[in-house]
From Swiss-Prot:
GO cellular component, one term: perikaryon
Modified residues (Isoleucine amide): I194
Species in which this protein is naturally found: Homo sapiens
Compartments (UniProt record): Secreted
Protein name per UniProt: Corticoliberin
């Protein structure tokens, strides 16, 4: 009893204790060809511009991890290439510059715009016009083998809940009657044995 408790407590402690940050995120590394004194690594903030050094560096895009439905997209810099997000004026300005980086405000605006868009997407029912059009396009692309099965399903009337519960009640009554018949048979046998 104590061993599983101790093991589960240990697993929870390991899972919940803060771990040291990833070294790849701590520093960008030395600039090639330049000698630098050893520095203490500082965590990076993806929405803040990196500190500028004396020598010019190539601009690097910062990744933003964004959850879209059940898939994760890794976007570098701006999020205007997201399939679910239309181009906003801020993101179209970002795409215009060849080596320009998005400002922190634009990056956060893009992130939250796409996140809100995903949260506010209407849930489509199976009989909505958009869902019917999507199914029609899928059938036109190669779902012809499902047509006979779908026709067969549409011919059968749907089973209502009342009918389902009625059938369940009848099955339970039949089982109860069979159990009573078996009990009566065993009682008869017992009475025959005792009566002899």
């Amino acid at each position: 009893m104590r061993l599983p408790l101790l093991v589960s407590a240990g697993v929870l402690l390991v899972a919940l204790l803060p771990c040291p940050p990833c070294r790849a995120l701590l520093s960008r590394g030395p600039v090639p060809g330049a000698r630098q004194a050893p520095q203490h690594p500082q965590p990076l903030d993806f929405f803040q511009p990196p500190p500028q050094s004396e020598q010019p560096q190539q601009p690097q895009a910062r990744p933003v991890l964004l959850r879209m439905g059940e898939e994760y997209f890794l976007r570098l810099g701006n999020l205007n290439k997201s399939p679910a997000a239309p181009l906003s004026p801020a993101s179209s300005l970002l795409a215009g510059g060849s080596g320009s980086r998005p400002s922190p405000e634009q990056a956060t605006a893009n992130f939250f715009r796409v996140l809100l868009q995903q949260l506010l997407l209407p849930r489509r029912s199976l009989d909505s016009p958009a869902a019917l059009a999507e199914r029609g396009a899928r059938n036109a692309l190669g779902g012809h083998q499902e047509a006979p099965e779908r026709e067969r399903r549409s011919e059968e009337p749907p089973i209502s809940l009342d009918l389902t519960f009625h059938l369940l009640r009848e099955v339970l009554e039949m089982a109860r009657a069979e159990q009573l018949a078996q009990q009566a048979h065993s009682n008869r046998k017992l009475m025959e044995i005792i009566g002899k």
